[in-house]
Amino acid sequence: MPHVLAVLDRTHDPANVEKAITMARSAGFASISVDLIYGTPGESLDDWRDTVSAALALDIDHISAYALIVETGTKLAAQIKRGELATPNDDLMADMYLMVDQMCEDRGLSWYELSNWAKPGHSCIHNTAYMQGRNWWGLGPGAHSHVDGKRFWNVKHPTTYKQKLFAGDSPILDSEQLTAEQSKDEAILLGIRMRQGLEIALLQPHQLEVLSEYRHNGFVEINEDRVLLTPTGRLIADRIVREITI
């Protein structure tokens, strides 16, 4: 929606999106995805329905939908602090999430990760590798990579990145070697976000006790070897993860 894009200070409009997708199809790309943000100040549930409908009408193969995060130091954060814009409403964002989930499912795009839906055979390879803790490379300014338990990231500024490459230097800014405990916590954090769920083998008895309470309240399902989020459980996935990894 144009007024939503204006609040987010975006320079494109819906017509640009349609044009870009048409060009991508013409260029031969077999999988095309659209990224959406919901919960923008001033965005109604009807606005969001129209946005998702417009995206699905383009016959795309994949949708990513993310709740708006107001980052400190941004223009949007300053506008909210001054009272010019309202703080995103959590209940409305929950309704928006459930709406995009249902609309995607109705059009044959099934969720495979909390924020991602795809037609059969069109799940994002990078997203899946990241969520499953496999090796992956990130190219470009600020990009992160993960190889054999080591995480590293590049300098953020494009000019600095370019200068290092032209000088024959590595653009890597810093790195860290994940401990066994960190790797396990990340496997829990990321695994529970996936449709196939979290392996019970990764959990300790006290963690299963916490999850049993969530099962009692209808937020998770626990079968022989996996923990699965229910639709309402997906709305509080971050809270569940915090409670089982502290």
Predicted features by range, described:
Residues M1-L202:
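C-terminal scaffold of the Radical SAM
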Residues S53-A55, L208, T232:
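Generic N-terminal initiation segments characterized by hydrophobic and/or small/turn-forming residues
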Residues Y161-Q163, N223, I246:
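Short, intrinsically disordered/low-complexity patches at protein termini
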Residues L202-N217:
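Short amphipathic alpha-helical interaction segments
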Residues R215-D225:
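A short, conserved structural fragment
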Residues R226-T230:
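Minor-groove-contacting beta-hairpin "wing" of winged helix-turn-helix DNA-binding domains
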Residues T232-I246:
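Short, amphipathic alpha-helical interaction segments positioned at domain boundaries
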